Amino acid sequence: MIKIDTSEIDKFVIDLKDTSENIRSDVQKVLKKSGFNIGARAKGNITNNGSVKTGHLRRGITTDIGNMEVTVHTSNIKYARGVEEGTRPHTIRAKNKKALYWKDAKHPVKSVRHPGSKAKPFLIPAFEKEKEVIMKDLEKIVKW
């Protein structure tokens, strides 16, 4: 009869499992920190690139922390994409009324031609700046 002692293998598996949980926890910390950094940078970019009129877009930037993921987004702000990417020329029509009217307009109109707007990116540049920091922090965790 041959008896094999597996106690060392069992210890190794337990250590590996503990290490895996520690790595997972460290990665989550890096993602959380970077998510909040990206959100803060994006808010700063909005202020710096002249996109602020009411502050609604800046206040709408939120960071959601999940399990091994972080999402930085603009919550329920329909025009955020237009600010980030710009818009093509388009026609604006009255939806709920018969005509459009604004202060200093000579008379109401059924539609107006908008020339489009240049992109004023705020979210992508914030991510691009933080990307290198994320990668360096993750490399430190993996190199144990």
Regions found by a protein language model. Name each.
Residues 1-78, 93-144:
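Short, Lys/Arg-rich flexible segments
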Residues 79-85:
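Short, cysteine-centered beta-strand-loop-beta hairpins and adjacent loop/turn segments enriched
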Residues 89-90:
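Short, His- and charge-rich active-site/binding loops that engage polyanionic ligands
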